[in-house]
Design a protein with these regions (language model features):
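Internal low-complexity, small-residue/proline-rich segments
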Residues: 32-290
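N-terminal single-pass transmembrane signal-anchor helix
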Residues: 4-39, 49
Length: 290
């Protein structure tokens, strides 16, 4: 006679559910870690490509577009000039041929997949998740002669949220600061740079906006500190906490930076201000500890 199959008891069912829950609990952090690593690797590649684009642009001792804090309508932004070297040559040629450019154009290489502030619906900002070192790129500097501290010791690009606390960062903008929509939630447009040492004047402000936090070098041997003591960069701030005067990273483990020699480093959240700002100056003469 065929025996009937014994049904699973309630206790056995609960045990199975508990085991599955434990396994899921063990797997989720691992999956999250894999995803975070993939995002970091993608962002690392983007930053490296941006620096290599600068090297290609600078062939023949060609000077970079000056980031001196002032507006020059006859020139394009640094990141616009790098477009042919970040897989955007067709778009660049169209702009040059027509004399016009579309500020709403999205450049994939300029966006970090980890940047939580990227807004796909914002079609007028030319968002950028990476910022060029304005302090090092003043006065039409040249790759071969403007970095006495060494290209391996000077930051070229740092991570930066594309939006933060009323401010949008744009690869298209040539100005340190402009006003787009006064009174709205994001009424300021800052070009995709950090460490701008120039105060910003705008017709909608009764007083000039303060400059970015930038390095001040003094002493013998030379040491650099931020123009506001103790500040370096922000680690995973909320949108409301974003300080447009500083760089930001979405990675808990530290901020990715591309050096002028093409290498990419991770700066720890607790980095000493003197070390960080010493890496921002191209000719400060500081001794940077590894």
């Amino acid at each position: 006679m065929r025996q009937s199959r014994r049904a699973m008891t309630l206790i056995e069912l609960l045990v199975v559910i508990a085991i599955i829950a434990v396994l899921i609990g063990l797997l989720l952090p691992a999956i999250a870690q894999v995803r975070a690593t993939a995002l970091r690797m993608s962002s690392t590649n983007n930053i490296r490509q941006c620096v290599l684009a600068m090297h290609n642009y600078a062939e023949g001792d060609r000077p970079f577009p000056s980031l001196d804090g002032f507006t020059n309508p006859s020139t394009n932004s640094l990141m616009f000039e790098l477009l042919p070297y970040v897989e955007e040559e067709n778009y660049y040629r169209q702009c040059v041929a027509s004399g016009k450019s579309n500020s709403a154009h999205t450049v994939k290489m300029y966006l970090s997949p980890a940047d939580p502030t990227v807004n796909p619906s914002d079609k007028g900002c030319s968002e950028a998740s990476y910022a060029a070192n304005a302090y090092a790129l003043r006065k039409k500097c040249r790759l071969g002669s403007s970095f006495p501290d060494g290209t391996s010791n000077t930051i070229a690009f740092a991570e930066h949220y594309s939006h933060g606390n009323r401010t949008q960062f744009s690869w298209y903008s040539t100005e340190a600061f402009t006003i787009s929509f006064p009174g709205s939630a994001s009424d300021r447009v800052h070009r995709a740079t950090f460490a701008e040492p120039v105060a910003v004047f705008a017709p909608f402000f009764a007083t000039p906006l303060p400059p970015d936090v930038f390095p001040i070098t003094s002493g013998d041997p030379p040491t650099s500190v931020g123009s506001e003591p103790g500040l370096t960069f922000q680690v995973r701030p909320t949108l409301a906490e974003c300080n447009y005067r500083l760089a930001q990273t979405p990675h808990a483990g530290g901020m990715l930076v591309g050096m002028f020699d093409g290498s990419v480093r991770t700066l720890a959240p607790g980095i000493a201000p003197s070390v960080y700002w010493g890496m921002v100056t191209p000719a400060g003469g500081e001794v940077i500890a590894d």
